[in-house]
């Protein structure tokens, strides 16, 4: 089973689309196909850069693409719901049992409120997901109606995830407009997520660092 087959699967995409619509109704930022593709590609790039096998890269991309599928059921515990739903969907493919277990474990552990990185697949997924911070994820058109999540994402004017040549550091470098979002606001939303990225980097044998406006903050 290849990532491209998953990304073109009509049933999987229907669940993802409806989940994103559900989140829009309750005021969440964008979790559309663009986010799924971004997380999938970034998870794959992380493992490729760190020297993992093509097979592991494919599994990370599949987990990355499907990670938010549980939102179609409920936002609360969406990671766990997503793992169960993904298990049923992947049973209908030619994916081996071992690979299916790896993918659903990564999906089930990607949320900072309940999960933790268990292996390199889940670690890459977590870092890819939690570092997808960008202005285009804000759905609300009226700035006066922005909540803290909207402000934090809209404030990001540039976001780059880089891996050092010697693989010793995975660094998220952000530029934010502090007239829109204060550093306090950013950390209120993202501190727990960034700490999960740090744990994930350790699983990958490296270190996670965060800089905001050129200042090292983690």
Language model features with spans:
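Short alpha-helical catalytic segment bearing the HExxH-like zincin motif
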Residues: 60, 64, 81, 107, ...
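Acidic/His-rich, divalent-metal-binding segments that scaffold phosphate/diphosphate chemistry
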Residues: 1-78
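Extended, compositionally biased eukaryotic interaction scaffolds
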Residues: 8, 17-24, 48, 52, ...
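Post-HEXXH active-site segment of zinc metalloproteases
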Residues: 77-87, 98
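Histidine/acidic-rich helix-loop-helix segments that form or flank divalent-metal centers
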Residues: 96-157
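Terminal helices and disordered tails flanking the catalytic cores of nucleotide-processing hydrolases
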Residues: 132-218
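Non-transmembrane, amphipathic alpha-helical segments
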Residues: 28-31, 116, 189
């Amino acid at each position: 089973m290849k990532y491209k087959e998953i990304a073109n699967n009509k049933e999987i995409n229907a669940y993802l689309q409806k989940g994103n619509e559900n989140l829009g109704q309750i005021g969440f930022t964008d979790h559309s196909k663009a986010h799924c593709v971004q997380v999938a590609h970034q998870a794959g790039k992380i493992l490729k850069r760190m020297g993992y096998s093509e097979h592991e890269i494919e599994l990370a991309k599949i987990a990355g693409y499907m990670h938010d599928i549980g939102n179609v059921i409920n936002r609360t515990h969406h990671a766990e719901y997503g793992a169960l739903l993904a298990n049923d969907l992947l049973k209908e493919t030619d994916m081996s049992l071992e690979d299916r277990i790896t993918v659903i474990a990564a999906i089930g552990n990607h949320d900072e409120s309940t999960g933790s990185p268990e292996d390199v697949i889940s670690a890459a997924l977590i870092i890819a997901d939690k570092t997808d911070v960008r202005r285009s994820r804000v759905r609300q058109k009226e700035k006066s109606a922005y909540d803290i999540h909207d402000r934090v994402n809209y404030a990001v004017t540039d976001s780059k995830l880089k891996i050092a040549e010697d693989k010793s550091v995975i660094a998220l470098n952000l530029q934010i407009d502090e007239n829109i979002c204060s550093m306090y606001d950013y950390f209120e939303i993202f501190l727990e997520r960034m700490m999960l990225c740090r744990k994930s980097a350790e699983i990958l044998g490296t270190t996670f660092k965060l800089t905001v406006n050129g200042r090292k903050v983690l």
